Amino acid sequence: MNNLRTKVLSAVLAVSVFGASAVAFTGCGKKDTTNDSKVTLTNVSYDPTRELYESYNKIFSKHWKEETGQDVEVTQSHGGSGKQALEVANGLEADVVTLALEYDVNAIRDAGLIEDGWVNEFDNDSSPYTSTIVFLVRKGNPKNIKDWDDVAKDGVGVITPNPKTSGGARWNYLAAWAYADKKYNGDEAKIEDFIKKLYQNVLVLDSGARGATTSFVENGQGDVLLAWENEAYLSIKDNPDEYEIVTPSVSILAQPSVAVVDEVVDQRGTRKVATEYLSYLYSDEAQRIAGDNYYRPYNKEILKEYSDVFDLNINLVTINDFGGWDEAQKKHFADGGIFDKIYEKK
């Protein structure tokens, strides 16, 4: 475990409050909550982590209570990762953020709320669990979708969120780009044409991954959902006879990022509990909670326990293949970038 694991003398009850609630950060004077009987914590997260943190908040509350004697109430806020980052940067109060990718945390850093070096605060570049991108198709796979070529062919209805607001959508896009890059040996004109054809098949761009799942699962739209692996497995768990997962030949290692919001925790006096909240995500107990919720545990030994669930031999590129998030964002998703160039609104 990393050296920031602080066993503190204060604490928490297993009450987790969910929804998109949070209070605007007002910057009142610094205080210390370590001697309070109860402390509150707000975790601003991305769209499909509701179930994960519903489970995690319960075990963390128990852990904190045992370690410190203090009760903790954790409030959750969920939405598209990019949108959530913007909300925090603009004043939505968060003690911690657990977002879909490093770039979104950097946006909060750039607003002056998170200190430089946050990515090194916890193990694995502050990514306690990972995921990847898969296809969710209807039972029997009626459109015979096996790889990215099939997603881009005529007559296929695709559901994916908007990469302008959703972290998962950016992972989706980059996974498709990686496939096309391999297929066309780096010929960017052909790669862009492939991505354009794929997005011409998109029926609706929801703002976040959970909204896209709702469009596909509950509203019956589309033939294939480009999805976080965990979101696809949850859909099958809830509807076991209606959907199948297809693993593409090339996908991407999706690394959600976690960080303490320094400006907020120092004002609220919650740094100790906030730091432990994120640090405990690396505990064996929490790593199994991640696996049970279909995220790939960072701990390789615990990941092996889920070898019957996850394809551990999947061909994955990483964000480093795109020059890191700053470069990927600038080239593909910033205003005037490639996505704006190729996507035509219906």
What are these regions (language model features)?
Residues 1-40:
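Short, low-complexity disordered leader/linker segments with a strong preference
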Residues 28-111, 121-122, 228:
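Early extracytoplasmic/lumenal segment of secretory-pathway proteins
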Residues 48-51, 81-84, 102-106, 140-143, ...:
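Solvent-exposed loop/turn segments at secondary-structure junctions
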Residues 91-97, 155-156, 218-227:
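Alpha-to-beta junction loops
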Residues 109-182:
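A conserved helix-loop-strand patch within extracytoplasmic ligand-binding domains
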Residues 134-136, 244, 257-259:
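Residues embedded in well-ordered beta-strands
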Residues 184-249:
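Ligand-binding pocket segment of bilobal, Venus flytrap-like solute-binding proteins
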Residues 265-346:
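Extracellular/periplasmic juxtamembrane helices and adjacent flexible linkers that interface
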